[in-house]
Amino acid sequence: MIAMKNIIIITGASSGIGQEFALQIDTAFSNIDEIWMIARREERLMEVGKVMEHKVKMISMDVTDEYAMDDFEELLEKEDVTVRMLLNAAGFGLMGPFDELSLEEQTDMLYVNCEALTKMTYICLPYMAKGSRIIQMASAAAFVPQQDFSVYAATKAYVLSFSRALNQELCDYGLYVTAVCPGPVNTEFFQIAEQYGSTLEIKKLTMITSEQCVSEALYASYRKKDMVIPGIPMKAFAMLTKIVPQGLILKIAKMMKK
């Protein structure tokens, strides 16, 4: 009888945090047969795959494409795999006043950050076994509403709530879900996000590296934590949101933008 392949699936694997997950997992996990890397940009996927030691399956697809997701589900069944870890790192954000960003761009955020993440989790769950892990990229933006980041912050609040609830549903079966809630991370995220608005300078002062973010995320997953907040500044911010009323935080943030 042929043993099932143990795999790790990473969405958004061609750049940023997703790419860093791929690189760190490649060196840290020896009992994995394949790493499946998913992203739209095939050329970028190939660049990452070239430097990895594990066998890599590069899947160029748009996670918001329903037909592509159907094909991916069929691939899972065909390959006879056990998903040892799912990392939902695909996502993006745009800054700016709600009425100045296009409706298409903002609904795209909903599709990528919420709907696609939910679908990918649902599709992969039947192929998981006791000890499998799910890591969902949320954000410190999930802790409080944010002016000029309204839709993005709302999508990440969904990811955080969904992930922590799902962890409670699955932990009795030996499956664990970790929501990762970083503040600013030194990736190309902000190059895209700042097309229509600028980031508060105080946020940039709290920026951490993708290496630190991913390292803390993997360690939290190993420890079966349902949430991790990488970086000391964001841990302090999270504590602040529990003490200070959200209305006051919103007023202070608004004054700082003037």
Residue ranges and their predicted role:
Residues 89-94:
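Conserved NAD(P)H cofactor-binding loop of Rossmann-fold oxidoreductase domains
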Residues 121, 155:
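Active-site helix of classical SDR
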Residues 97-98, 102-110:
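Substrate-binding pocket helix/loop in short-chain dehydrogenase/reductase
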Residues 139:
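Residue(s) in the substrate-gating loop at a strand-loop-helix junction
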Residues 179, 200-237:
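C-terminal helical subdomain
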